[in-house]
Amino acid sequence: MKTIKPEEINPQPVEFNGAYIPGVTIRWLIKKEDGAERFAMRYFELEKGAVIPEHQHEWEHEIFILQGKVLITEGSEERVVEKGSAVFIRPNLPHSYKNIGDEKVLMLCLIPYLKG
């Protein structure tokens, strides 16, 4: 069994198209090296106004908002999501995230490991 708190892991910058995204960090809480063969659990922090630009890939996301208010787009759909909400992002659809609140957004994001 592994137990860990996010603050026990150093935050890493998030890279997008060869550059770091300002105001966004990630902490890999649970990953393959921990014995998790099917899913990874990640902890994101988005500072006020920070944006994870539109992107897409072949895996889904399962997200839980721990703090803050975030505008999430998936394809042509936009939703404002707040603390205590779960979100499912479908695979192969463009999606993005923007902190539109007055505080930092904290969110858990699970992704599957795809068989290659």
Locate the predicted segments by residue.
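Short acidic-glycine-tyrosine-enriched beta hairpin
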Residues: 77-91
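Anionic, Ser/Thr-rich low-complexity intrinsically disordered regions
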Residues: 40-41, 108
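Short beta-strand segments in beta-sandwich/barrel cores
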Residues: 50-52, 68-73
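Glycine- and acidic-residue-biased ligand/ion/polar-headgroup-sensing regions
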Residues: 59-61, 65-70
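Conserved short histidine dyad/triad with adjacent acidic residue
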Residues: 42-57, 91
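A short, N-terminal "cap"/entry segment at the start of jelly-roll beta-barrel domains
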Residues: 1-38
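Ligand-binding loop in jelly-roll beta-barrel domains
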Residues: 91-116
